[in-house]
Amino acid sequence: MKIGIVLYPTFGGSGIVATELGKALSRKGHEIHFITYSQPVRLDKLRENIYFHEVRISDYPLFDYTPYEQVLTSKLVDVVRYEKLDLLHVHYAIPHASAAYMAQQILNSQGIKIPFITTLHGTDITLVGKDPSFEPVITFSINKSNSVTAVSKSLKEDTIKQFDIKTNIEVIPNFICFEEYQLSNNEKYKKRLAPNNELIITHVSNFRKVKRIEDVVTVFKNISKKLKAKLIMVGDGPERNKIEKLCREYLDHSSFTFLGNLKSTIEVLNISDVFILPSEKESFGL
């Protein structure tokens, strides 16, 4: 099949899952077309059966904000028509599902049939979806999807509770390739981050308030009173500066390290003794 995958190309979970899914499908012989505004961070190289179509965003003096949904819709119409796609798979309800529906209707008027699947990932429902101004669009685009999936049972239940959903939602959990995480020679990397053989405690997130990263610092502070430990912070986001300041204020300067965004977390998770994720809410926890 020729499949178009629409995603956010950033370090967030939905973009990573969408990228890895596309790569896996390409290995099975499907032709995958990623459609987004920049190359996905986990798409390190274009390989056989994988193509990337950039949604170019221009600044128009008339608009205070770039109308990304309309630009994306036009790009979807173009790629479906030119590449003769069989299916669109959109990850994250806003604005991808509504853009896919608009593209579907435009193509339908030209005699081209293109179904689309919407996958719900979490914050598109639990956070963004709570804004009443988005509710009609989210409800409409989910109901108009040819198929809808959610990454967990709890997310499915939240979606049904918050929106007037008339269509079936199938739960398809996120996935991980265990073989990729079986690293044998990681002592050198561990020695660099924990030279005194400290217990390594790791947090990975997009540093938003919902991740409750202040609690990570509090927990680590208590642990470090009794054990030799090292706190590894992976990721970036709006709360990072605040959390860094907190660490400098309450922790020994040699007991924590901020690594920023990593394209792959395989190495750091392999050397970690504890992974801590005290989120207020997670659609797909561990």
Predicted feature residues:
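Carbohydrate-associated surface elements
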Residues: 154, 175
